C-alpha cells in the first residue's frame, strides 16, 4: 500500500506538521507577541508580576526566585504575596489582584470550568510538585489502632460516631486524594464521614483541639502534625 501523502515517512508531511505546531505555539500568546513587536521591543508585557502562594513546601520555587533575584535576568520583578486560603487565591486570580499563583491543579480546572465559582480562562504554565501530600490521622485514632485505611475502617465500624476529615479546597488535589483513599478503604467519603475545608496552615491547630480526625494536605503540615 502506498504511503499517505502526510504520513510520518514523508518529509513533506513532517515539515507541514512542524509548521502547524509552530503556528499553534505562536497563537497561544497573541497579546504578548503583538504588544512586543508592535512596539519594536523585547520588553516584558508587565514589569511587576504579583504571584500568590500558600505556605507549603512547593511554594519554594516562587518565593526563592524572588529572594535570589532570578527574576531580574528577565527584566521583571516578582512580588510574592502570602495568601490565607486557596479560596482567597482563586478569588484574587479571578478578579485580577494576582497575575498568577502557586495553586492546586484541581482548583485551576475548577475555575476554568466554572465549578463552585465564577468561570475564567486559566493556563497551567509549569508544575511545582509531583505528589508531595500526606494523609494524617489523629493521635487519638492511632492510639486505638487506626494507623492506615483498613484499620481506620474497622475503628469507624466499631465506634459509631461522626468522623470528620479535612481537605484544603473542594476541587483541590488534597480533597481528591482524601476521597479516593477513604473509598479504597471501604469508607464512603460522602456518607460515612464528614469532609470539611481547612486552609493548610490551620490543619495542625484544628487537629490539636479535636476539630477533626484526620486531614490531607501538602507538606510541611503533615510532618508538623507528627513532630
Segments and roles (model prediction):
Residues 197-201:
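Active-site glycine-rich loop that binds ribose-phosphate moieties when present
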Residues 1-15:
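N-terminal secretory signal peptides
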Residues 39-190, 194-196, 211-226:
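Short, glycine-/small- and polar/acidic-enriched structural segments
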Residues 4, 19-38:
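N-terminal export signals
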